[in-house]
Amino acid sequence: MKHLFIILSCLLPSLCSVQTFSGEYTTEWQWDMKRNTNWLNLLRLNLNVPVFDGKGTIEASTLHIAKTNETIIADWQTFSNIEAENNVAAIAVLGYMHEWQAAHLFVGVRNVNEDFFTSDITALFINSSCGIFPTIAASYPIANYPFSGLTVYFDVSRGGWTFRNSLYNGTGYNGWKRRDNPFLVRPAKDGVFNISQLEYAHSGAHYFAGVAVHSRQYTVGPDGEMPS
């Protein structure tokens, strides 16, 4: 039987002004009840700059990930929702968001965790490292934490209903190299990924329904790896 103890702590400092800068720090300590331990750290830095008299916002967020050891349990989905390879200044969000009274439009780099199937408890919840989309992310290399990709996103709200839709490059990236960066658009190689969600909120409860379509098919090996 696999056991894992995780200690979580969060620090959310923020500086409020016309331009908003904030940071979120999450740490986990893992122990397999034998002799193996692991210490994971995730720092997210956010910057929002209002433009066009507040009708639009330049959004930027980076991820900084550090851990002391490799995965201590031989399960390719693992037990942590933040565990990933060490990385510095991976782009989570970088683009322009325009706001109307009941709608938003974003163009730039983004990932699915920013907008879809999010609630108070799914913002930080211990489950698979495939993120909040374990089935989709296990089948396709989408822009799911810790990866991002070029995106066109919009949402429309009316009453308690909200419809969201995003169109992404079919593969997510988190590097700073020529062939590994979230600004790549390669539909012939990576495919195109679209996800839609209908959300209903009532009396503090949220109900979700969604559909996702990918233009490519990927073979997943027994270790969970997908060929590039």
Residue locations for each model-derived region?
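Sec-dependent N-terminal signal peptides
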Residues: 3-15
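Short loop/turn motifs that connect adjacent beta-strands in outer-membrane beta-barrel proteins
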Residues: 16-21, 33-36, 48-59, 101-102, ...
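Sequence/structural signature of outer-membrane beta-barrel proteins
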Residues: 28-32, 65-69, 114-116, 135-137, ...
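Residues that define the transmembrane beta-barrel architecture of outer-membrane proteins
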Residues: 31, 37-43, 87-92, 146-150, ...
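Outer-membrane beta-barrel domain signature
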Residues: 32-36, 82-85, 138-143, 183-187, ...
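Outer membrane beta-barrel
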Residues: 49-170
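Active-site substrate-binding loop specific to GH73 endo-beta-N-acetylglucosaminidase modules
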Residues: 129-137, 178-179, 189-192
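Long, well-ordered mid-to-C-terminal structural blocks that present hydrophobic/aromatic surfaces
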Residues: 200-228
